[in-house]
């Protein structure tokens, strides 16, 4: 329990590295980076980097800019793994702290790559499919498919499937929040 403040602070440091990855590649490919900073997201501090300037980069470069944050986290995970093993072999209590930090880091990576959250995974999918406003268009596609007459239904399957997954995901998430899971 006494390690939690250290884990909390160090997880912010890893998040800074994540955002630094976006900044470095955006600056490399575009020469400019938008605003960076800290904001409150669900009453929790969250770092952000405005990479809208990357819209003018080539598609492959945009994908690399989006993946740069997770790449930095994966590099941190490798370093944390080596340090964890070294600390455990030395019999240090720091091994537990490093293990907890690495687990949190992997949870952040998973959450970041989940395309149903509007984080890096969402933007990867949006750029890969070359569809701007993916959330809105996918939900609109589901509503259009549901409301259209049978003979008028011509749907974009990708948008429809993503929209159904998105709606289902948020129904489950909000239900879990409401009932307190």
Predicted regions and their residues:
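Hard-cation-handling environments
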Residues: 149-181
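Membrane-embedded catalytic scaffold of the fatty acid hydroxylase/desaturase
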Residues: 2-154
């Amino acid at each position: 329990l006494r390690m939690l403040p250290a884990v909390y602070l160090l997880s912010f440091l890893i998040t800074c590295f994540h955002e630094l990855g976006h900044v470095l590649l955006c600056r490399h490919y575009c020469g400019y980076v938008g605003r960076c900073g800290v904001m409150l997201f669900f009453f929790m501090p969250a770092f952000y980097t405005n990479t809208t300037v990357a819209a003018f980069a080539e598609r492959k470069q945009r994908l690399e800019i989006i993946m740069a944050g997770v790449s930095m986290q994966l590099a941190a995970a490798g370093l944390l793994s080596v340090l964890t093993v070294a600390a455990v072999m030395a019999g240090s209590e720091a091994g537990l702290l490093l293990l907890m930090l690495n687990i949190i880091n992997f949870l952040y990576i998973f959450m970041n790559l989940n395309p149903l959250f509007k984080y890096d995974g969402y933007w990867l999918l949006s750029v890969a499919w070359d569809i701007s406003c993916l959330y809105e268009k996918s939900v609109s596609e589901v509503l259009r498919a549901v409301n259209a007459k049978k003979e008028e239904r011509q749907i974009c399957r990708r948008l429809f499937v993503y929209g159904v997954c998105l709606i289902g995901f948020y129904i489950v998430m909000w239900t879990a929040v409401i009932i307190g899971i």
